Amino acid sequence: MFAKVAFKNFTPLKSIAPRSFSTTSSRAFKVAVLGAGGGIGQPLSMLLKLNDKVSELALFDIRGAPGVAADIGHINTTSNVVGYAPDDKGLEKALNGADVVIIPAGVPRKPGMTRDDLFATNASIVRDLAFAAGETCPEAKYLVVTNPVNSTVPIFKKALERVGVHQPKHLFGVTTLDSVRASRFTSQVTNGKAELLHIPVVGGHSGATIVPLLSQGGVELTGEKRDALIHRIQFGGDEVVKAKAGAGSATLSMAYAGARMASSVLRALAGESGVEECTFVESPLYKDQGIDFFASRVTLGKDGVDTIHPVGKINDYEESLLKVALGELKKSITKGEQFVA
């Protein structure tokens, strides 16, 4: 199947399904989900149906999207939902007029696979969708969920450049699940409240490139307990792949994270100030080391990326993690860029 295959201002339920029945007037937007029939796409689409900043929800997939649209279209919120198939210019229709485009399309991980193992299949899918999006809705904000994000976001950039419409502020790699896992897993170790723990996660979105900055979240752990927590955050997806025994990867938690990132982007587009997420964007932070993309805290605005925040003060342990991450990131980014070059 084509489908499977985003801190401080975040209140989980309200952020994803804010005031679904509110009579308060506010600007709403068209959101397109590419890969809406898959394991992530279906629950992601449902969560977006609950968001009062979505006026129109366009669902596309090579199969199943009209059925998903018919199903979630019964949910009693005001947004209109339409599902599109590839025939009769379905992709173009889904993208036409979209303010935000979310891409969870691609194949899922199976036991023993890393995110990077998905490159061979997912790279071409993301490239082709980027071409279509760039030609149809060049001013949209693009949220790439498809793994390996460290490579697919550079692919998306290169494709947009080919079309002549790339705007760095408009392109996001969705790494929100790393932040979600960091707060949840840390709360299990510290007995704190997950929703009150804000752990910045920088770097990338694959294994050792995921660098949780526990020190910035006020978490003081050392030794084996710290190492185990860091490893679990970095490789938490493996738990789900193993538990599902070949039947899929982290689809539901990823849908939640994707909906959170989309909600943050929509809130910023609507004019809300101070909206922040950790996200993988074209960044100046490590360009002097040849690394054009990096995940860090980003303040969102009406034009997408507003402010890219530096990593900030970190301890020696985190510095060592970051050094490893940068080396891996450079290789993954280059791999993606060369795919379209």
From Swiss-Prot:
MF terms (GO), sorted A to Z: L-malate dehydrogenase (NAD+) activity
Q: Which reaction does it catalyse?
A: (S)-malate + NAD(+) = oxaloacetate + NADH + H(+)
Question: Which residues does substrate bind?
Answer: R109, R115, N147, R181
What EC number(s) is this enzyme filed under?
1.1.1.37
Which InterPro entries does the entry mention? L-lactate/malate_DH (IPR001557), Lactate/malate_DH_C (IPR022383), Lactate/malate_DH_N (IPR001236), Lactate_DH/Glyco_Ohase_4_C (IPR015955), Malate_DH_type1 (IPR010097), NAD(P)-bd_dom_sf (IPR036291)
- What are the recorded Gene Ontology BP terms? carboxylic acid metabolic process; tricarboxylic acid cycle
CDD domains named in the record: MDH_glyoxysomal_mitochondrial
Name the enzyme's class: oxidoreductase
Q: Which domain of life is it from?
A: Eukaryota
Where does it mainly reside? mitochondrion
> Can you say where in the cell this protein is located?
Mitochondrion matrix
What is annotated as the active site? H205 (proton acceptor)
Instruction: Cite a GO CC annotation.
Output: cytoplasm
Q: Name one Pfam family in it.
A: Ldh_1_N
Instruction: Give binding positions for NAD(+).
Output: G35, A36, G37, G38, G39, I40, G41, D61, N122, M254
What keywords sit in the KW lines? Answer: Mitochondrion, NAD, Oxidoreductase, Transit peptide, Tricarboxylic acid cycle
The record's listing under SUPFAM superfamilies reads:
LDH C-terminal domain-like, NAD(P)-binding Rossmann-fold domains
Q: Report quaternary structure and partners.
A: Homodimer.
Q: PANTHER family, alphabetically?
A: MALATE AND LACTATE DEHYDROGENASE, MALATE DEHYDROGENASE, MITOCHONDRIAL
**NCBIfam families cross-referenced by the UniProt entry:** MDH_euk_gproteo
Q: Which family, according to the similarity comment?
A: Belongs to the LDH/MDH superfamily. MDH type 1 family.
**What's the protein here called?**
Malate dehydrogenase, mitochondrial
To which species is this protein native?
Schizosaccharomyces pombe (strain 972 / ATCC 24843)
Q: What taxonomic lineage is listed for the species of origin?
A: Eukaryota, Fungi, Dikarya, Ascomycota, Taphrinomycotina
